């Protein structure tokens, strides 16, 4: 079973979502032989908990849940626990928040990532349900019903959080490469003359001023549009030099200073996009973080947030693999935005609220705050292969579920996914998604 530390950690997170403005130290949770007793003031409520056999069955995806209405009463959510009282909201919440299943699974895809197919959210069909947050809303309802004079819910204002991984700084690097891209890829492969015409227009602008490259201008547009909408976008930049592994642009590119000046003006948050190899090599992520800080020094920035390239987060316990928690901590990262499934949009962590990650190895809470990734552009059209209409419907559905539980809708849209064949997705999916 889960430890007392894990129980307290999970209960505190549920309380933060249920009663965001309430002092959680007012509560005390007591672990009983067959359940939990939550004490507050002179009152208390009891909840059941799984035994060891039920916990193992849950982790294997073999537990049969019962169902209740969700907070918005638009569907149903599963409850797990003892058969006679399946209302253990703490044990399964710990599994989702801590990514417990990932710590003990050596099954990975070609990029060393934990797969959606092996996840509990897949086994219990929860990928589109912020189940932990739904449980927090149940806790809120029960506490308010128990002591209405003590608890008056003060809902948290949900947020839309646009994020942008700058995998590619520019589309055009030379005349030869530009013409090859236009007449090779666009004309011969896409065979869409509208795209070819658009590319030629972009090429002519680039020829007159290389800062007019469409990928650079996409960054500028993101910052201006999203700041004007009252949002706080986060931009993740690689910190590599030409010739290093995974380099697609050199951080010393003079155009980046102009980009960062604009982001500084528009109050965009700048983070580190950890290179592919930084998930495997000791000290590399810290080196990249220090390098990015050097180039941002004139803006008084200190980079403390990151997202790994290819969403390469490793939590599996093994002496041969570096642990992402250690890499982030050693690099001075306080906020991570990596945890989402590349192959499926939704709620990998069971929540859309920022929360501190838990170190299962050492049975303690960390000081690294996770901002779960809910939607990624490439997931919609590369992995799930959705049409614009279906991608918009899924994105809006997930956004609404974040709003229903007062969480953060974190969406990733790359700066190279705004033009050509991606333009319909950008205009038809992304722009409606960030509409307040």
Locate the predicted segments by residue.
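Metal-dependent polysaccharide deacetylase catalytic core of the NodB/CE4 family, i.e.
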Residues: 168, 172, 194-195, 220-319, ...
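Catalytic domains of cell-wall/extracellular-matrix polysaccharide-remodeling enzymes
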Residues: 11, 19, 33, 277-365, ...
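Conserved acidic functional residues
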Residues: 165-167, 273, 334-338
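Terminal accessory/targeting
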Residues: 1-250, 341-344, 353, 360-436
């Amino acid at each position: 079973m889960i430890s007392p530390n894990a129980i307290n950690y999970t209960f505190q997170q549920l309380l933060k979502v249920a009663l965001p403005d309430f002092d959680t130290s007012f509560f005390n949770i007591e672990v009983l032989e067959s359940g939990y007793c939550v004490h507050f003031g002179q009152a208390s409520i009891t909840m059941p908990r799984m035994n060891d056999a039920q916990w193992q069955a849950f982790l294997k995806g073999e537990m049969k849940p019962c169902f209740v209405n969700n907070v918005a009463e638009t569907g149903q959510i599963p409850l797990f626990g003892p058969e006679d009282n399946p209302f253990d909201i703490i044990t399964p919440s710990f599994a989702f928040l801590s990514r417990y299943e990932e710590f003990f699974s050596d099954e990975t895809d070609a990029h060393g990532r934990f797969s959606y197919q092996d996840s509990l959210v897949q086994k219990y069909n929860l990928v589109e349900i912020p189940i932990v947050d739904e449980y927090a809303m149940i806790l809120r309802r029960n506490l308010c019903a128990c002591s209405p004079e003590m608890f008056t819910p003060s809902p948290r204002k949900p947020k839309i959080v646009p994020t942008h991984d700058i995998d590619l700084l520019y589309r055009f690097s030379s005349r030869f490469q530009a013409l090859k891209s236009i007449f090779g890829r666009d004309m011969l492969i896409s065979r869409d003359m509208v795209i070819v015409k658009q590319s030629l227009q972009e090429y002519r602008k680039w020829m007159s001023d290389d800062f007019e490259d469409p990928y650079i201008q996409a960054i500028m547009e993101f910052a201006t549009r999203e700041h004007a909408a009252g949002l706080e976008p986060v931009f993740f930049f690689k910190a590599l030099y030409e010739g290093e592994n995974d380099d697609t642009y050199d951080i010393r590119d003079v155009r980046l200073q102009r980009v960062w000046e604009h982001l500084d003006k528009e109050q965009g948050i700048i983070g580190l996009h950890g290179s592919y190899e930084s998930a495997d090599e000791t000290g590399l992520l810290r080196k990249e973080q220090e390098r990015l800080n050097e180039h941002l020094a004139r803006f008084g920035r200190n980079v403390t947030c990151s997202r790994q390239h290819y969403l390469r987060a490793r939590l599996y316990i093994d002496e041969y693999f570096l642990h992402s928690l250690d890499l982030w901590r050693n690099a001075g990262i306080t906020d991570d935005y990596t945890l989402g499934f590349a192959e499926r949009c939704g709620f990998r962590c069971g929540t859309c609220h920022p929360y501190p990650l838990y170190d299962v190895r050492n049975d303690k809470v960390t000081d690294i705050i996770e901002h779960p990734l809910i939607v990624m552009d490439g997931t919609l059209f590369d992995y799930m292969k959705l049409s614009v209409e279906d991608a918009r419907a899924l994105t809006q559905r997930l956004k609404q579920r974040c709003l229903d539980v007062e969480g953060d809708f974190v969406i990733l849209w790359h700066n190279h996914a705004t033009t050509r064949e991606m333009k319909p997705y950008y205009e038809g999916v992304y722009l409606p998604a960030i509409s307040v």
